[in-house]
Amino acid sequence: MAMEDSQILELFYARSEEAIRQTKEKYGGACMHLLRNLLQNELDAEECASDVYLALWNTIPPEKPEPLLTYLLKIARNQGLRRLTYLNAQRRDSGPVVPLEELESCLASAETVEQTLEGKLLEQEIARFLQTLPKKDRQLFVRRYWFCDSVKEMAESFGWSESKIKSKLLRLRNRLHDHLTREGFL
């Protein structure tokens, strides 16, 4: 049986390496799922996961995240995006299309997408936008643009065709664009 988050955090605060083992046991699957989807390469995902657990070790303490899974996945996503930027710079090719690239048309210019996404105001506004969506649409948006799930995975999960998923994602991006324009972000 997996440990409770509070027990895992106590291990981190005691500087016990068991904290990493317990975190991997409880949340390693979710972390790897996100990294595999983002990096599209098993070896890169495994290497990045090591960086994620090191970052987790280095930030707890002083952080005491609740819930631990959200904190872990935020670190994983940030590490994965850094790794993807590094790998694409090394390869000098476009690589796979990262779902965030689909959002570029909804946000500012392509050159400022990363800086804009880092802005707390924009982050809060996107969260407000998501709260206005029906549950299924919100799940679809988050799975695509946070977890980087493929259209095929989502179609299987929702029981919809891939074209329906693509169409709904397009409409969601258009709604986000309209929302951000109305709120003065674009």
Residue ranges and their predicted role:
Residues 9-33:
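A short, charge-rich alpha-helical start-of-domain segment used by transcription regulators
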Residues 24-25, 36, 144-146, 170:
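Short amphipathic helical patch at the helix-1/turn junction of helix-turn-helix
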Residues 23, 27, 31, 52, ...:
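Residue-level preference for hydrophobic side chains embedded in well-ordered alpha helices
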Residues 12, 31, 35, 45-56, ...:
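Short, small-hydrophobic-rich alpha-helical interface motif
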Residues 74-96, 119:
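Arg/Lys-rich amphipathic alpha helix in sigma70-family domain 2
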Residues 67, 81, 126, 137, ...:
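DNA-recognition helix of helix-turn-helix
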